[in-house]
């Protein structure tokens, strides 16, 4: 089941959420860094029957052409040729030539459409997906490290529930409608399965694992002159190198296993090659996640929670005399460094470390951003990547930094906690009185807070069940002030997920360092790139499902079509709101979250106090479920005073006119009599000024006897009237809060 082209939209005060319901379970989702030739963003997600590739945005495919039948009744063409098929001959190969419209499908302020989807059926569930750690770019600029195949092919790796690991290549251009409607695909249910080459795809099977892999990573092999080759044929082959990738996968075999494969991208469509691993590492404990360095392609970041974060280099031999391998890499790599997280808090001295949820490379592979299970995040500066580092002298192992604190903890350059994670890091307080009495305790806000702290206290056993992740997206140079900037998405999953976004990592890192040094930087009222922003009201798009993943989608570009129709990046796209969109992974839904254009981006203090109210000028009625009431209209004025006051300009409530019509559209000056047989009207007498405030009481009994006017009742908007009354209450409450803030309370003790 593919994504529906039009998602279900939900708006909140902070963001807009577009929900795609798939109807089947989703195991993993990734954003491919290269755009398609027509400017679409490519998404890949795994499900119980394989993987699905989605092209989102860019220029639309042209509608399929109607099939014309050139055969005429009663005539016989002179040039008719009879073709006798034989079993040895095969039919002509279908060549797909998709055609696209000239204008892009994304207009300013609209939702990017789903241009095309393609299901790659593998007959088993795809649990994990890995893409190349390259910066986002257009198709014509995708020659990363000299790999020209990336200009025309999608290259990614998947792990399956049947212990198989595949490297898949696929054309970067989406298939046309004619290609998906070919008659040969209707002959069998298995005709369109992956591996047969009907979509131009190639599969390479990586053998070796005997259990399902828990993670996978992929990177390019950097071409270099090697002295390890022992034959002239191998040296001649290196003159015209073939693009190769290295795939790493870890599993729970034995106590933990890490395997690496060297895969050449030379398979032909319709064939499945098999590759054996060139390195196998047996570990003391299973790994949680792995990722390759985007610059130093041979370095692999491994997370062994809760012990440490370690860096493995498969190209550096563990022993200098290791020359038994005939390939370009040694038979055994080396472990370069181990980074240790802090210890968990508890009522007594704890010897358990905080579980490591995730860790990712940042600053072009020179630093590591990590997230712990109690909501703490930290940055390890390995190579002087700090924005305030002078000449690279303030890295983790410089003279000014010992690297290890107490020989057991690796010091963070900067650290903090995610918003909303205080119940995870506060240890439970054992109260002897409450534990021994056993009396019933009513649920109050204070006891509810204690219950949350008890359920999610900072004990290592309870923190081990916390799941989350980190996604780092490199930003194009046109979206930020400098080249090489990055955005990060940190999340802790669950029924009420915590998802935070760092718009620009370098500016956020710099502001944190200045704050730690007492530089006077106000993180609450600073510019948006210097703060960590938490996405709120995510349950509106997930519709009750648990959040199992979050990835970043770089905002590529908006509608500047060049001469060849390829979308180019807009310099102003990064100046409004976040430079990325967040893709949330539910159990059976995908939710794309982006910041509203009218969302307040000023100081957080003014937003919390309600001192600034944004007007929704471009609000239009949509056929969607919204998470807030419609646009507010001017409230109706009411006179709540008992005594009549002269009208004063600038007052909050204007006095009510006495000659206005009543609720039943009749004049108040003449009130019908309630006596039977008396059809004359009784003139309304003026009451004394002291009783004018209670004149409505005489109208209530008379109004109750009158029949209801159904036409007027249908025209009334009762909901709007209730909202007007609520608006009055809010205004009075804000006035009361403003008066309370300016009042100081002084207590005197009796001597």
Curated annotation (Swiss-Prot):
The nuclear pore complex (NPC) constitutes the exclusive means of nucleocytoplasmic transport. NPCs allow the passive diffusion of ions and small molecules and the active, nuclear transport receptor-mediated bidirectional transport of macromolecules such as proteins, RNAs, ribonucleoparticles (RNPs), and ribosomal subunits across the nuclear envelope. The gene is NUP37. Residues 423-438, 683-692 have a biased composition (Polar residues). It comes from the Eukaryota. WD repeats lie at residues 21-65, 162-209, 237-271, 282-322, 351-390, 455-492, 494-534. Residues 716-750 form a coiled coil. It is found in: Nucleus, Nuclear pore complex. This is Nucleoporin NUP37. GO terms for cellular component: nuclear pore. Residues 57-77, 419-443, 671-692 are annotated as: Disordered. GO terms for biological process: mRNA transport; protein transport. Residues 68-77 have a biased composition (Basic and acidic residues). Keywords: Coiled coil, mRNA transport, Nuclear pore complex, Nucleus, Protein transport, Repeat, Translocation, Transport, WD repeat.
């Amino acid at each position: 089941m593919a994504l529906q082209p039009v998602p279900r939209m939900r708006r909140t005060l902070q963001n807009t959420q577009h929900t795609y319901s798939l109807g089947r379970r989703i195991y993993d989702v990734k954003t491919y860094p290269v755009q398609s030739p027509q400017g679409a963003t490519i998404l890949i997600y795994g499900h119980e029957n394989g993987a699905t590739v989605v092209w989102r945005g860019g220029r639309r495919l042209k509608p399929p052409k109607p099939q014309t039948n050139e055969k005429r009744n009663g005539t016989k063409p002179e040039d008719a040729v009879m073709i006798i098929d034989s079993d040895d001959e095969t039919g002509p190969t279908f060549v797909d030539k998709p055609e696209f419209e000239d204008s892009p499908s994304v207009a300013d302020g609209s939702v990017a459409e789903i241009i095309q989807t393609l299901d790659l059926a593998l007959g088993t569930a795809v649990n994990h997906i890995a893409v190349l750690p390259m910066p986002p770019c257009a198709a014509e600029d995708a020659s990363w490290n000299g790999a020209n195949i990336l200009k025309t092919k999608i290259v990614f790796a998947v792990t399956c529930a049947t212990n198989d690991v595949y490297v898949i290549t696929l054309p970067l251009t989406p298939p046309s409608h004619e290609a998906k409607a070919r008659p040969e695909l209707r002959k069998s249910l298995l005709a369109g399965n992956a591996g047969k080459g009907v979509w131009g795809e190639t599969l390479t099977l990586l053998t070796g694992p005997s259990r399902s892999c828990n993670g996978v990573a992929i990177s390019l092999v950097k071409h270099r002159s090697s002295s390890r080759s022992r034959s002239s044929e191998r040296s001649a082959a290196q003159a015209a190198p073939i693009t190769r990738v290295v795939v790493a996968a870890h599993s729970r075999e034995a106590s933990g296993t890490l395997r690496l494969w060297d895969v050449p991208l030379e398979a032909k469509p319709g064939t499945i090659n098999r590759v054996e691993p060139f390195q196998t590492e047996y570990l003391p404990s299973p790994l949680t996640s792995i990722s390759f360095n985007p610059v130093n392609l041979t370095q692999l970041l491994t997370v062994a929670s809760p012990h440490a974060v370690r860096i493995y280099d498969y190209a550096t031999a563990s022993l200098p005399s290791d020359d038994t391998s005939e390939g370009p890499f040694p038979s055994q790599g080396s472990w370069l460094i181990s980074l240790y997280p802090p210890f968990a808090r508890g009522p007594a001295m704890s010897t358990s470390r905080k579980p490591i949820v995730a860790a990712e490379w940042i600053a072009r592979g020179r630093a590591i951003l990590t997230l712990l299970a109690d909501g703490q995040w930290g940055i390890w500066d390995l190579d002087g990547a700090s924005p305030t580092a002078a000449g690279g002298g303030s890295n983790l192992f410089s003279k000014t930094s010992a690297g290890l604190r107490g020989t057991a903890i690796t010091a963070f350059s900067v650290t903090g906690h995610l918003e909303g994670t205080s119940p995870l890091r506060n240890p439970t307080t054992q109260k002897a009185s409450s534990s021994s009495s056993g009396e019933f305790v009513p649920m109050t806000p204070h006891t509810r807070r204690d219950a949350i702290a008890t359920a999610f206290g900072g004990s290592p056993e309870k923190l081990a069940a916390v799941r989350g992740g980190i996604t780092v997206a490199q930003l194009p140079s046109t979206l930020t002030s400098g080249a090489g900037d990055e955005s990060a998405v940190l999340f802790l999953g669950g029924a009420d997920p915590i998802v935070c976004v760092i718009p620009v990592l370098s500016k956020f890192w710099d502001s944190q360092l200045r704050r730690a040094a007492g530089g006077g930087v106000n993180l609450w009222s600073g510019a948006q790139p210097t703060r960590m922003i938490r996405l709120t009201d995510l349950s509106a798009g997930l519709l009750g499902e648990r959040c199992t993943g979050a990835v970043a989608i770089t905002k590529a570009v908006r509608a500047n079509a060049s001469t060849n129709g390829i979308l180019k990046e807009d310099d102003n796209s990064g100046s409004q709101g976040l430079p990325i969109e967040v893709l949330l992974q539910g159990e059976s839904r995908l939710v794309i979250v982006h910041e509203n254009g009218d969302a307040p981006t000023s100081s957080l203090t003014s937003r919390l106090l309600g001192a600034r109210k944004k007007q929704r000028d471009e609000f239009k009625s949509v056929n969607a479920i919204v998470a807030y009431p419609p646009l507010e209209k001017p409230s109706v004025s009411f006179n709540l005073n008992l005594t009549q006051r002269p009208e004063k300009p600038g007052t909050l409530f204007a006095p009510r006119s006495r000659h206005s019509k009543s609720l039943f559209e009749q004049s108040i000056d003449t009130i019908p009599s309630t006596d039977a047989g008396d059809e004359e009207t009784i003139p309304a007498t003026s009451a004394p000024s002291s009783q004018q405030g209670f004149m409505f009481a005489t109208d209530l009994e008379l109004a109750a006897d009158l029949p209801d006017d159904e036409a007027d009742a249908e025209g009334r908007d009762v909901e709007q009237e209730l909202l007007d009354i609520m608006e009055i209450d809010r205004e009075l409450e804000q006035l009361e809060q403003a008066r309370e803030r300016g009042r100081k309370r002084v207590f005197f003790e009796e001597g």
